[in-house]
Amino acid sequence: MKINSSEIIIADSTLGDEKDLVHILKTTWLATYPSKEIGITKEDILSKDFDSEKKVSAWRETIKVSGKKSKYVCVAKDKDKIVGFCKASKKKGFNELDVLYILPEYQGMGIGRKLLDRAVDWLGRKKKIFLKVAAHNKNAIGFYEKYGFVKTGLIKRDRLVNGKVMPEAEMALRLKPN
């Protein structure tokens, strides 16, 4: 099946999207994060229990307040199928790009840039925008650097249930003067 990226629509997330978001999280984590270099296996990734009702419910609650308060979620759709999403948060003193995930078969088509543009528009450029990315995810780091993010440092954070640590790079988007 040939995918036409011009048919991809970026939209605000709505209630009912939460199971699709969890599916995309699980699929992209399994495709991206296992690494012999840092000792993370597929089993380690699966230990996050992506499919739990607790995770689905947490996304449902986030979608309910999306755009109204300090959180925003947008999705990329190929017809009726959600193929990617982005979540951003307004914090005191700075803003944050919390997540940006696209199904592997849809990566490299400009969808990430469209989602990021939408999130940055919502956040505004009055405060720095930070993100954290797995330090071994060179494709994502390159994508963010092309967008204008710069590395600020390396953070070690326990992300997995089994106690394994996945090193992350923190990045910040330079503010552009008005």
Feature map (PLM): residue ranges:
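Flexible, glycine- and charge-enriched loops at secondary-structure boundaries
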Residues: 52, 109, 164
